[in-house]
């Protein structure tokens, strides 16, 4: 299966910013992203390498099921979320703020 660049640019939705993701970034050189529900690990790896220009060591994914929430008498449901924990090769560093600034200039 060939991966086209248009698909790769859509795979990563948004970086996850939380206490856990910050600790992983500092101690384990891992970045956390929300990704498309049907994204595969090879696609995620290729997308990170293409968009941020870093080498990826491994990708771990987890799908979090959406919670059921009540709005008065109406039952609603939050969407399922797929997260990817991307481990970078030693010596590689990913600065999301610099990457976002560079993307804004284009």
UniProtKB/Swiss-Prot annotation:
InterPro entries: Nucleotide-bd_a/b_plait_sf (IPR012677), Ribosomal_uL23-like (IPR013025), Ribosomal_uL23/eL15/eS24_sf (IPR012678)
Claim: RNA-binding is one of the keywords in the record: yes
Entry keywords, A to Z: Ribonucleoprotein, Ribosomal protein, RNA-binding, rRNA-binding
Annotated SUPFAM superfamilies: Ribosomal proteins S24e, L23 and L15e
Top-rank taxon: Bacteria
CC annotations in GO: ribonucleoprotein complex; ribosome
UniProt keyword annotation of rRNA-binding present: yes
Gene Ontology biological process: translation
Molecular-function annotations in GO: rRNA binding; structural constituent of ribosome
Pfam families named in the record: Ribosomal_L23
Protein's job: One of the early assembly proteins it binds 23S rRNA. One of the proteins that surrounds the polypeptide exit tunnel on the outside of the ribosome. Forms the main docking site for trigger factor binding to the ribosome.
Subunit annotation: Part of the 50S ribosomal subunit. Contacts protein L29, and trigger factor when it is bound to the ribosome.
Family: Belongs to the universal ribosomal protein uL23 family.
Protein name listed in UniProt: Large ribosomal subunit protein uL23
């Amino acid at each position: 299966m060939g991966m086209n660049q248009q698909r790769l640019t859509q795979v990563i939705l948004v970086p996850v910013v939380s206490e856990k993701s910050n600790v992983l970034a500092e101690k384990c050189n891992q970045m956390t992203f929300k990704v498309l529900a049907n994204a595969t690990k090879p696609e995620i790896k290729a997308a990170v390498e293409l968009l941020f220009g870093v080498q990826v060591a491994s990708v771990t994914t987890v799908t979090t099921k959406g919670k059921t929430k009540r709005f008065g008498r109406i039952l609603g449901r939050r969407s399922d979320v797929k997260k990817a924990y991307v481990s970078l090769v030693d010596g590689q560093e990913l600065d999301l703020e610099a990457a976002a600034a560079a993307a804004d200039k284009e």
